[in-house]
Design a protein with these regions (language model features):
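Active-site metal-binding core of divalent-cation-utilizing nuclease and nuclease-like domains
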Residues: 65, 105-110, 119-167, 173-177
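Soluble or luminal CAZymes and related metallo-dependent hydrolases
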Residues: 48, 110-114, 180
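Hydrophobic, Leu/Ile/Phe/Ala-enriched alpha-helical segments that form helix-helix packing faces
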Residues: 37, 53, 57, 86, ...
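A generic fold-level signal
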Residues: 13, 71, 113, 147-149
Length: 274
């Protein structure tokens, strides 16, 4: 079968998974995207991956930003035409809201890349069951009557030693204004779809600042360092601001009561409580 000059036939098992991953990530580096294809088993050859990406960029389905500050790598996002195509095939996205235009969202690039790394760490360890990204969350919140209390960065389902556990995730690379955290703390009592919120933050100062707004929260909110997630995953220490105690994340997810005894060696360092 012949196709019009300049057209592209999308491969169901290779091209479409690539486009879906870029859409769900919103922004993703070249190296991150290749690792996603490896871990999700839909591309094995690096040369084939390079060829496929050049093809998608050349046909205008993928937008490429070269050497975005702070990444040292090319960064991809989907073009509006590709997002519309994926939406027609059942993907959750809000094409009409301008959220797929790279030109309008450069400030979110590093945030999205950081979220990709959080997801990849769980994938590498075989812990990730499902990652519901911000685009799918926004779609559910804006288009249905059963939305979450806020637009989280992700809803994450992981495997623990006693079963699957789900939690909302917020990644704070830089702090927001105080009024934003007050609003978040106020709305969390309305959350009915997920029963844990984890804040991963870039450093101790942000942890102290953000956690201070949740000291009276009834809803379970935990705080931890991004570096600890990448090093220890479910064994990472998290802070419960209500008890002012640190304990392993898996204990928080499993609903166990914090104990006074020392944590395992990998998580024995202290988090700031005050």
């Amino acid at each position: 079968m012949r196709y019009p000059k300049g057209s592209i036939q999308l491969n169901q098992s290779r091209d479409l998974p690539l486009l879906r991953q870029i859409l769900r990530s919103e922004f993703v580096t070249h190296s991150q995207l290749f690792e996603f294809t490896q871990l999700n088993h839909y591309e094995r050859s690096r040369n084939s991956f390079h060829w496929r990406m050049r093809r998608l960029v050349d046909r205008g389905l993928v937008l490429r930003q070269t050497l975005v500050a702070g990444t040292g790598d090319a960064v991809y996002s989907v073009a509006s035409s590709a997002a519309t195509l994926l939406q027609s095939m059942g993907e959750y996205c809000l094409v009409g809201c301008g959220r797929t235009d790279a030109e309008k969202a450069n400030r979110n690039v590093l945030h999205a890349i950081g979220l990709n790394e959080i997801q990849l760490s769980a994938l590498r360890a075989g812990l990730l069951v499902r990652w519901m990204g911000s685009m799918e969350i926004r779609s559910q919140n804006e288009l249905t009557a059963f939305g979450f209390a806020k637009d989280y960065d992700a809803i994450v389902t992981v495997r623990t030693d006693i079963g699957e556990r789900r939690f909302a995730l917020e990644y704070e690379r830089t702090p927001k204004a105080a009024k934003c955290y007050r609003a978040i703390a106020a709305c969390m009592s309305q959350e009915v779809h997920v029963n844990r919120l984890l804040y991963l933050v870039a450093n101790y100062d942000i942890l102290r600042f953000v956690s201070g707004f949740f000291t009276k929260a009834v809803y379970p909110v935990f705080f931890g360092l991004l570096t600890d997630w990448h090093s220890y995953l479910l064994e990472m220490p998290v802070l419960d601001v209500l008890t002012k105690r640190a304990f392993p994340l898996k204990q928080a997810l499993n609903g166990a009561t914090p104990k006074a005894e020392a944590m395992p060696t990998a998580t024995s360092h202290r988090l700031p409580f005050h």
